[in-house]
């Protein structure tokens, strides 16, 4: 449940979402739920100038392991072989709740994904991960470039979390608050 559930090689620009309530099970955000690839080829997607204001984005859970994963303000999840660039976007006065990989701008980027976030801001937003990987800008990422971004929101994760053995790929960010 997002404005765009899944996108592949998209250009999305200058959208504003205000006073929305978005709920679902995973790969969830106000703008794009998941940025995907087709047939394993490398794909590029651009999200620019999008704003999410005074909204609630939260996952539901019915006991499935993937419930509550990859919840973000602008994008939920980035699949393998995807290059995502988020530029000049902001999330303001929102509440974002999930279990794993919850971020103010991006929830999570999977192994072999590459995300670049520039000139984007999380302002006065409460980000909560009930299990792990909560971040003001990004919850979890494989290859990540962040430039000229800021977070002045509240970030809350579980009191005690551990990284599962063997599940941390090289060049990853895990349980880091940006």
Enumerate the predicted regions with their spans.
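Predominantly extracellular beta-rich ligand-binding scaffolds that present long acidic/polar faces
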Residues: 1-178
């Amino acid at each position: 449940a997002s404005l765009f559930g899944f996108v592949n090689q998209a250009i999305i620009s200058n959208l504003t979402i205000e006073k929305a309530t978005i709920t679902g099970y995973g790969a969830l955000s106000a703008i794009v739920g998941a940025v995907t690839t087709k047939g394993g080829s490398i794909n590029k997607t651009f999200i620019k100038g999008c704003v999410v204001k005074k909204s609630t984005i939260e996952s539901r859970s019915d006991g499935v392991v993937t419930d509550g994963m990859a919840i973000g303000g602008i994008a939920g999840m980035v699949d393998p072989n995807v290059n995502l660039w988020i530029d000049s976007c902001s999330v303001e006065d929102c509440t974002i709740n999930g279990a794993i990989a919850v971020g103010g701008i991006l929830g999570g980027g999977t192994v072999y994904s590459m995300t670049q976030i520039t000139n984007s801001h999380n302002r006065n937003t409460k980000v909560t991960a009930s299990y792990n990987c909560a971040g003001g800008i990004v919850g979890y990422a494989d290859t990540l470039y962040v430039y000229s971004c800021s977070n002045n929101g509240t970030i809350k994760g579980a009191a005690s979390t551990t990284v599962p053995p063997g599940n941390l790929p090289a060049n990853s960010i895990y349980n880091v608050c940006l």
